[in-house]
Amino acid sequence: MKDIAHRCGVSIATVSKALNGQLDIGEETRGRILRTAEEMGYMTNAAARALKTKRTYNLGVLFVDPMHGGLAHEFFSAVLDGIRSEAERSNYDITFINNLGSRASTYLQHCRYRGVDGVVIASADFTDPMVTELVNSELPVVTIDHVFNNHIAVVSDNTRGMEELVRYAASRGHRRLALIHGEKTTVTLNRLAGFYRACEALDIPVRDEWVREGVFHDPQGCCRITKELLAQPEKPTCIFFPDDYSYIGGLNAVTEAGLRIPEDISAVGYDGIPLSRIVSPVLTTWRQDTAGMGAAAASGLIGLIEHPRTAILDRVVVRGSLQEGGSVRQLTETR
């Protein structure tokens, strides 16, 4: 790089930015550096493609985690693995965009600085003005589990998933159902619609005091809400948790109350993460195809980048499936 910098009359840092596809340098300077690198035999495959196609072959992944669970959280870890695998299959790199750095720069500015060709929004507050700015920018954007008009969105069938879980609980004789749902997002609203729709179809009364708002991926909050449900004079026979990870808090609350799942109260999760299969009893849950969601998002974004005139801006629904465990008791009578 030192020789390239000397010949072009720029710093080594500027050469590094040009070779890595970052766009915070002038186009003329960038082009001169890439041509010089090619002449001197320093050209990497990525740099050569960038010179030829005017693309960096770098996908941005916006991941904002308000619960600070990080990429270790099983649901998003699987989604991100799907994005990474599909990107690598198409010879793209990925760069994570998040809010851990200085808030002085917006998500869009961060993306431009990193020189990404497009962005998958994997997890974010979709009402955040910085997210809106990014979605409305010139960059191709694909969202996961949220729909913007005139953009590709990859969504799981949350309404159907919740309907199937309610039907399963009802088939086991349960009619006193409690639901702890996540914060008010598109995902939550769709699951609530599925819950109410299935209960109405099965003529199951829904008690308002048994439908409680929590937060996704928050075992502590679910522990507290579960204790409140168990303290009521008439208890539900089955509690629906917002996700499998949050269920751990509910399980702790049940255990602390001297009760057992499913002998004393039944439980249902959502997501189907590996954790749900190693707890005892195995959790009945709705398994989402998380890797499939990530791969579909990356594939849609790459198609949008490479074929902008023919890409279809549509909603891609990734189906899930019921994972039956041992956490829902068969009641001897329906009440």
Which residue ranges define each predicted feature?
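N-terminal helix-turn-helix DNA-binding module of bacterial transcription factors
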Residues: 1-57
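Short gly/ser/thr-rich secondary-structure transition/capping motifs
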Residues: 39-45, 99-104, 251
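Structural motif corresponding to alpha-helix initiation and N-cap regions
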Residues: 44-45, 104-106, 127-128, 219, ...
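Short strand->helix junction
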Residues: 22, 69, 101, 184-185
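Alpha-helical recognition/docking segments in bacterial nutrient-uptake
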Residues: 58-167, 171, 231
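Bacterial carbohydrate/catabolite-sensing allosteric modules
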Residues: 7, 39, 82-90, 135-143, ...
